[in-house]
């Protein structure tokens, strides 16, 4: 993983060793303590940088892919596609991403900025629609491959090899519980396995959207928490690794993501809000008194400026206009003071 004290071989060498920080204001008065791993500080901006690089490296090692020859195709809610696009650009691969049209405009723009081609699918079909489209494209494009994040064992493996050890080292082995949103299930599976090998007492909790709580035995449905709640149980997810599932409504995740930015200075995306909301629920339990709960901020809020996360803020920002000093001072509640020209 990334060595921040030397020059990287290429951009992919900068992945990992992301920082951790305590949540302070939002946990005030709660029995437990919460810390977050800031995964949006990976070079392409999300936790998925880890699996994008790992899956491609494994395919290169076994000769499945060749730079400049193989076309990479990947169905994604956005972040894995961006991670693959970033690694593909660094290593010289053509990359095609299929994703539901409901994903944010920033994701489409980022994918194209990295040189990838984007194919949108019916949002009503969720991730299954994107997966079906990717499979159809693979059948028709010679020399193409799907790295298949939902099925690829290198997905949880890289979290077992990197994210888990980083959390253990950064917490000096004092982590008591981890809680992660389930998209592919790679993070919770890999991190959970590693930490429970170090300390079988570490508790693991999953997070899913209230509106699409399939891990809780409910039907799949539309929701706004991009990156989790794929609508099915992925093959790489170890459902025995977690003891319970915490359901977070999209609206709660959005509010928490907003609070994270203006109360903690952490600009996370909607799934970051879901993770922290779940972690705070755990921290509020009496049995969590004095315990350290760890979660992650999977991606940055800048990736969601056109999403429901920032609708009100975006509209307010776009409505700003050039005004006089007096008008600005009145807006800033300084109308009782003399105006100095």
Swiss-Prot record:
Positions contributing to pyridoxal 5'-phosphate binding: 79, 183-187, 271
GO cellular component terms attached to this protein's record: cytoplasm; striated muscle dense body
Pathway: Amino-acid biosynthesis; L-cysteine biosynthesis; L-cysteine from L-serine: step 2/2
A family per Pfam: PALP
rRNA processing among keywords: no
Enzyme nomenclature, EC number: 2.5.1.47
Expression sites by tissue: Expressed in AVM sensory neuron, BDU interneurons, pharyngeal I1 interneurons and M2 motor neurons.
Catalysed reactions listed for this entry: O-acetyl-L-serine + hydrogen sulfide = L-cysteine + acetate
GO molecular function terms attached to this record: cysteine synthase activity; enzyme binding
Domain of life: Eukaryota
Cofactor needs: pyridoxal 5'-phosphate
Record annotation: effect of changing residue 75 to L: In n5537; severe loss of protein stability
N6-(pyridoxal phosphate)lysine modifications at: 48
Main enzyme class: transferase
CDD domains, A to Z: CBS_like (cd01561)
Protein name: Cysteine synthase 1
Name of the encoding gene: cysl-1
């Amino acid at each position: 993983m990334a060595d921040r004290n030397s020059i990287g071989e290429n951009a992919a060498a900068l992945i990992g060793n992301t920082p951790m920080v305590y949540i302070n204001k939002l946990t005030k008065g709660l029995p437990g303590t919460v810390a977050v791993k800031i995964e949006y500080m990976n070079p392409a901006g999300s936790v998925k940088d880890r699996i994008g690089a790992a899956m491609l490296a494994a395919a290169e090692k076994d000769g499945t892919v060749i730079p400049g020859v193989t076309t990479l195709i990947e169905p994604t809610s956005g972040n894995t596609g961006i991670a693959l696009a970033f690694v593909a650009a660094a290593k010289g691969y053509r990359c095609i991403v299929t994703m539901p049209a409901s994903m944010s405009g920033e994701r489409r723009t980022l994918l194209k900025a990295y040189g990838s081609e984007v194919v949108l699918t019916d949002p009503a079909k969720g991730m299954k629609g994107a997966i079906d489209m990717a499979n159809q494209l693979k059948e028709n494009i010679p020399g193409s491959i799907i790295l298949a994040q939902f099925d690829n064992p290198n997905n949880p493996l890289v979290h077992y090899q990197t994210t888990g050890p980083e959390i253990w080292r950064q917490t000096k082995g004092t982590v008591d519980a981890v809680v992660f949103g389930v998209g592919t299930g790679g993070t919770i599976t890999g991190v959970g396995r590693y930490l429970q090998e170090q300390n079988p007492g570490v508790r693991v909790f999953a997070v899913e959207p209230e509106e699409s709580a399939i891990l809780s035995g409910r039907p799949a449905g539309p929701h706004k928490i991009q990156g989790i709640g794929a609508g099915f149980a992925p093959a790489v997810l170890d459902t025995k690794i977690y003891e319970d599932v915490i359901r977070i409504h999209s609206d709660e995740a959005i509010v928490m993501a907003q609070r994270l930015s203006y109360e903690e200075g952490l600009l996370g995306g909607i799934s970051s809000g879901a993770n922290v909301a779940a972690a705070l629920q755990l921290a509020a339990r009496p049995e969590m008194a004095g315990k350290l709960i760890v979660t992650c901020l999977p991606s940055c809020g800048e990736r969601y400026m056109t999403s429901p996360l920032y609708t009100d803020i975006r509209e307010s920002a776009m409505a700003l206009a050039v005004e006089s000093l007096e008008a600005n001072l009145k807006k800033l509640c300084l109308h009782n003071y003399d105006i100095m020209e």
